[in-house]
Amino acid sequence: MINISFPDGSVKQFAQNITAFEIANAISMSLAKAAMVVEINGEFKDLSTVIEHDCKLRILTAKDYECLEIIRHDAAHLTAAAVKELFPETQVAIGPAIENGYYYDFARDKPFSRDDLATIEAKMQELVKKNEKITRELWDRDKAIEFFLSIGEHYKAKIIASIPAGEQITLYRQGNFIDLCRGPHAPSTGFVKYFKLMKVAGAYWRGNSRNEMLQRIYGTAWATKEQLDNYLFMLEEAEKRDHRKIGKELDLFHFQEEAQGMVFWHDKGWSIYNTIEQYIRKKNRKNGYIEVKTPVLVDKSLWEASGHWAKFRCDMFTLETDDKILALKPMNCPCHVQIFKQGIKSYRDLPLRMSEFGLCHRNEASGALHGLMRVRSLVQDDAHIFCAEEQITDETVRFCKLLTEVYKDFGFTDIKVKFSDRPEIRAGNDEVWDKAEHALKTAVEKVGFIYTLNPGDGAFYGPKLEFVLTDAIGRQWQCGTLQMDFVLPERLDANYIAASGEKKRPVMLHRAILGSLERFIGILIEEYAGKFPIWLAPVQVAIATITNDLNDYALEVQKTLIDNNIRTDINISPDKINYKIREFSNQKIPMIAVIGKKEQANKQVTIRKFGTTGQEILSIEQLIAMIKKENSNYL
């Protein structure tokens, strides 16, 4: 007999060589029917797995979040099986689960059409209804290569050929379809019920542009119909909110081929950019940061000394001049260390909080560029805190509080924290890492954040915190970071005089709240769907006249508002007032000030707020006071 330990703490005895499915069935028939996979001693396995020894066991159903990846992997196989039935001449390549879905790569001469996707999806539904059994098979490597070559699946044969000789190969069979896979998989195709094929795109074999182009079918799959419907609704909403679309509609920015990955900011977009920078600058100043400006172009010798040349050389833009190699900086940290090193620093100077809106350049692949979300030229709300070891916790607490304030001001209150601890390959000894990790954990707990652990995901030079925002339609964005660094101060020979009189290395905390300003503005455009709050809106008040004889008063109102640093637009054309209001509403301007004869006579305006039907009559002084009060909360 063997002892099986369950998650509830119970231990039960079963006959040796029992399968996981038989254990599920012994517990209850309904559990066995719902079971998808099993976790044995922390490793996910098929239900057909034979258990020979004592173990910890957990039976998983579609209700367990871990099964979502299984469902998506099963859906990928289901897609390939459907394609092979419909288009037998097509070769299959690879099909992994990815975030929110899966893809499968195919090789065929004729491109898949939209109609083909609908046909494939219908065939998948047929296979689900058949509830075909999914079985795991162990094959000899060479025989597996021979088999796939015999059925014309050259890509599968190539993948297997890259596996060391002598290794056993795992194949999964469902109906007439067989695929190379490590697994695990559900017992049958009937477990994949809620899916949709999304699109077709090109993809190079093995991700190498020198290889042949394959066709990649993307799909999504979920555990319930509600989850699928919610995801499709989110995608539909995301398409409406696409920052590239709204950016064009609101005349905020554009991109063009002559400067790939570089933003052409228009006046309204640049207004948003500068307002955010002004806001962050004020927050930093209140929290004891100094602001600096460092060169954009720096000799490669500094990047070699910092270690960035060895690690990021391929991602850096370089040029040669006067027998020197210069690089556009991809980050600000080595330059900040140079400022720290100017003059002798004492323990009394710490912590030194140094901020910069530093212009950085990164040579991102053209295929990875995506509007404001992924660019080659970017500015970060970057700062580095030089501190003593004993100051790490307090500085982290201070930063977390500042970050929370900033996110709240932009409307984000759902903040998730990820804590990444020591990787296997790392600098520093365990004692240093123990102190560093304890300091960060203590700080996060003091602020009241609940964090999830990313084991071993820290940088080799220190642990880190990542801060993830959830937007209005449920998407998550990792923006803020706090990264501890023991290595860079040593590499660049930064030190301070301790109270004892000896030289010590400062600890360096790399931190950002927004991350790239370009990306954060993209996130905000989609979060607000272009409807910016009044303090951030590029045009705060739009003035519209009912008749032309009111134009002089309207221009007088505009001048008064501009003199009070209020951003305005005006339409004094002969167009009808309803047309003017509609045009300004399409631009999502927070306030429209309508001027008629009555308003002129009383030195007033009638205010229509965006998204509301009501109106409010205000004096010019009242309007100015209202907007100034709103601005003063942030700027």
Curated annotation (Swiss-Prot):
Region Catalytic: start-end pairs: 242-533
Compartment(s) of residence: Cytoplasm
Subunit structure: Homodimer.
UniProt keyword annotations, A-Z: Aminoacyl-tRNA synthetase, ATP-binding, Cytoplasm, Ligase, Metal-binding, Nucleotide-binding, Protein biosynthesis, RNA-binding, tRNA-binding, Zinc
Entry keyword annotation includes Plastid: no
Protein name as catalogued: Threonine--tRNA ligase
Cofactor names: Zn(2+)
Catalysis: reaction(s): tRNA(Thr) + L-threonine + ATP = L-threonyl-tRNA(Thr) + AMP + diphosphate + H(+)
Cofactor note (record): Binds 1 zinc ion per subunit.
Listed SMART domains: tRNA_SAD
Residues that, per the record, bind Zn(2+): 333, 384, 510
Lineage of origin: Bacteria, Pseudomonadati, Pseudomonadota, Alphaproteobacteria, Rickettsiales
Organism: Rickettsia typhi (strain ATCC VR-144 / Wilmington)
GO cellular component assignments: cytoplasm
Molecular functions (GO terms): ATP binding; metal ion binding; threonine-tRNA ligase activity; tRNA binding
Entry EC number(s): 6.1.1.3
Family recorded in the similarity comment: Belongs to the class-II aminoacyl-tRNA synthetase family.
Main EC class the enzyme belongs to: ligase
